[in-house]
Amino acid sequence: MERIHVAVRARPLTAEDAGSSPWRVSGNAIALSTQPSIRFEFDRIFGEECRTADVYGARTKHIVDSAVRGFNGTVFAYGQTNSGKTYTMRGSGNEPGIIPLAVHDLFRTIEEHLDREFLLRMSYMEIYNEEINDLLVPEHRKLQIHESIERGIYVAGLREEIVTCPEQVLEFMSFGESHRHIGETNMNVYSSRSHTIFRMVIESREKVDESEAGESCDAVRVSVLNLVDLAGSERAAKTGAEGVRLKEGSHINKSLMTLGTVIKKLSEGIEGQGGHVPYRDSKLTRILQPALGGNANTAIICNITLAQVHADETKSSLQFASRALRVTNCACVNEILTDAALLKRQRKEIEELRAKLRNSQSEHWEEEILNLRNTLLQSELEKERISLELEEEKKAKEQRDKRLIEQAKKIENLSSLVLNSERDDRTTVSSKNKRRLTWCPGLLSRQFDGQVLESVQEDPPSSTVRHGRNMEMPLHFEELIQESCESSIKHYTDAYSSGSLSCEDDSLPDSHALLHVTSRRKPNTMKKSDQEQLMGLASERIIPQELNDWKYTTQSQENIKACVNGLSARESEAILVIKQLEDQIKLLELEKSSFQNNLDDVLELATQQKASFHEKYEELQQNALVAQEQAKIANEKLSKQEAAYEFLTGIFVETESIAVQMDQSTRSVDNALSFIEELFQNLFMMAKNFTEAKQFVCGDITQFSSVIRDYENISNCLREKLSKLEMEKKILDEQSLDQKDELQRLKSSLESCEKAMEDCNIQNELEKDSILSELLTLQKEVVYLSSSSLMKEKESIRKELDRTKTKLKETENKLKNSIQEKIKLESEKAEAQREIKKLQSQRTLLERDLRKRDSFTVDKRHEQSVKSKELAGIYDQAVQIQEDYGKLEMHAFDMEAEIASLQEALVTTIAEKEEALSRVELLTSAVEDLESRLNSAESETSSLLEETAVLTRKLDASESISKKLEASISSLSREKEDMGIELTDVLLEMESERSTWTAKEKAYLEAKQKLNICNKNNCKLSEDLIKVRQELACCREQYSILEAKMIFSKNDTNEEKYCRETFEESERLLKKERNIDTGVNENELHQQLLSITEERDKLLSEIKYMNSVINESELIQAKATIDELSSRISIVEAKMKNDASAYNKENTKLRMQIRWMQPELDAHRGRLKEAINEMKLMDTKYLEASTKLKKDLSFYCREVLRLKEQLKESQVKAS
């Protein structure tokens, strides 16, 4: 069984499509970057820069080589329209496609096989709108699909051209391509509108010289190579198909949908369960039925485009290809063997065996074989002669029976004629009473006598010849005569005892009586020939005739008496009739006496013939007994030879099955299998020689001793080979240890990588905390600067911002380095996974080799034990071998357990690595958040700088106003020197107070805006809290699912504890979130603002009052109160900022913890799923191994019993 090989080839993209492509290819896997759960793995994935020759060398080259060896092969390209299928199959002038490469490679491999003759036939067809057209003969359209036992599924009327070179094939192909249906759509200028199937039929047989012509077996290998270019699936909305193009697209999509359903059902194993697979729903799947789950090597090339526009079509193509990976085929050599070819092959093998027997045995056995052949031939000739005699006797008996039936019919006809004539005579008896009455003329009597004479004179050739081939002895001649006499007497008595007849019927004479009457009329003129005829007639039928005559006379007398008593009117006429009848009775009595004399003579002749027949019968009986004994001897010899031939044929069948298995296994382990095949052939030949020697040389003790010596030599050779096998096993064990070391080294490297990742994470977290602290300090400083109006501090803030930018750039570089390290670790992980896969494949190969070698050694050891029982009784060694085999099995089970533990360790390391990668991703996301926050802080600082610039402008304006006021005050002071000074001071103080109040009002407005921003942030945080709670609810549900699964797994208690701890941590975090009462903070701030506004109103009223009164004491008190209020406002703002920063920190911490918890929960889910799958796999492997071991044990027990029986038979024959 071999699954379908699936390769994926991506079409090159433009620069625009390459930038927006959502697909990511890593090794032999492809996944969507937007949805990482959508991931596909295939046998090979070829990128955009690969060549068609690389695609051909991956699998198609092997399929072409196997087609030359007799295996069917199919390669087809699948994908959406405009994905490069036709380019892959046909190629271009610069780069040939799959079909030209396959054709050239096919002829090159044929030239390498010099020992065979080949005949190549090619055909080229298309399926257009569910109609099959012949591209080599365009007139042949609408061809039909048929199925037969000899040819399988084929297309009737399809032209097949015989080809001899690749150039001829490519010419026919280009001719067919010129007649293929091609159209133009919005997506492709040259779009294939039909499916094409390029088929090569390869017939081959062995080359035979004229001297070896009689020895060849005439076996012909016939294989079919299909290279299919499918039309692409398409959407009418994208292609813009209308009219004919729309109809073509619908037929293409329908056939591809049927292909998809067939692949799906085969991948699900519905055909093996007895379900229906719809091959007949489309002509494409009907033609490709042998390639889909049948007798062929199949490869699928899935062409895709990685552009964003075709993401859905690419996804569906990859899903089809992934389903095709699960479909398995059973490819085998297609060899046509006629009965003559089989006979030739068997004769050849028999002659080889005879030649070996001649080399190993003496001439005495050859003479005995020749004698046995002669006796067999003589017995066959005797059988043929006896069968011919029996056939001749059967024919003669059939002819005799036919003649007797004809004679009986003639006698009945004559009797009816005589009866009619008698009736006529009785009507005219009154007028013709003086005439002589005759019932039959002379000619009729003579004819009848001649016929009777012919029947009597026919003597059977040999009454003692046996009927059939049943070897039973015939009856004696006396018994046959007695049986005939008894049958005639019974017939007579039955006739006589039957009821009373009427007068008219009783008066009618019998046909035999008429014959006697005619003979009475002319007794003197009767010749000797007539007498001899009557004597011959009497030898067979005289007794029943006389009995009939006597019956007739008695009946006639009784009738006469009855008639005399009944006469009344015609007495005279009746008396005459009575007298005539009395005369007739007298004549009959005279004839009776003459017949009695004749009967005595006939009896004497019969006794003489009986004696002669008895002597002949005894001679034939003796000959038959001798022939029977010879036939028995020949049958015994034939049965022996047939048993030997059946045994040889059974061995031959077994060797063919084993050879097929060995051919299949040679692909993986060629060197080891070649050695095993040589050893198996040698042992098989030895076993054949031993069985034939045991059959032909049972009683010869000297040859038996030579066979024992040969067996000892064979056993020595086997021991040497067993020692070699044990050495190879040790080497394999060492290789497994090396692989274990490599696995440990990989584990250590993974651990070191994880440690490095953890260190990087710690450093990033520290840097993040430092950056956050610096940001907080900067925010505080910005707030402080907003209250002050010094330019130097602004410049220092800018410098610090530049420094933070440089630090952020450094952190970005570090993050980039960490990302690069992550990519390197991913590549190392992929390489490690590849190495692990390679190691696993090597392990499977080694296990397979070990199993085969173990089974082989077990078979050979059993054979040794049986032969030693037959020859010398080496039973202890077989027991030891079985114990060693058990130890080896235990060792194999230990190795499997170790491999399973290593696989589990690898799974855990991979999961841990994935966790580390998820943490790195989280760190990158955190850094991005920090960058966004820094950008927002920069924007805020820029806005603050703008505000400070506005404030400086206002200060400049206020200074100019103050200067003007000072000028006016100086002028007033001149006028009013006494009051001017005081007024100027008051005015200056009022102006300063107004400026401070305007600044405070602006600060109040800014605080209000910040409060609004805080409220918005609180709303956002509440929404985030709701989302977090929903995620926690999901986590709880997942945790409940995981907890239900954890009940079934006993060994995962640690993970369950870890999950519970994580759940408790999440609940604790929820409690913390619940404890954070945002509403309380908002209420406090609102109350503080209300108090501030009240104090502000009071101050405004006080200022108005001060303006009205203008007292110096009140102004001093107002200044004090203003200072106190400004300090309070600054404290409140600081508290609000601190609360907001603490709230943001706690929210970010909670989000980070939730994000960190999510991948851990996913990892735990994956671990549980993998553990469950591994348990299922282990159970299935254990069941399969136990069933195999049981079968092997039953088979070995049967062989032991059979060999014991053979030993007993050989001992009995020897004794």
Curated annotation (Swiss-Prot):
Binding site for ATP: G79, Q80, T81, N82, S83, G84, K85, T86
GO biological process, one term: microtubule-based movement
Gene Ontology cellular component annotations, sorted alphabetically: microtubule
Alphabetized GO MF terms: ATP binding; microtubule binding; microtubule motor activity
Pfam family, one: Kinesin
Classification via PROSITE patterns: KINESIN_MOTOR_1, KINESIN_MOTOR_2
Ranges for domain Kinesin motor: 3-327
Keywords: ATP-binding, Coiled coil, Microtubule, Motor protein, Nucleotide-binding
Similarity-based family: Belongs to the TRAFAC class myosin-kinesin ATPase superfamily. Kinesin family. KIN-7 subfamily.
UniProt protein name: Kinesin-like protein KIN-7I
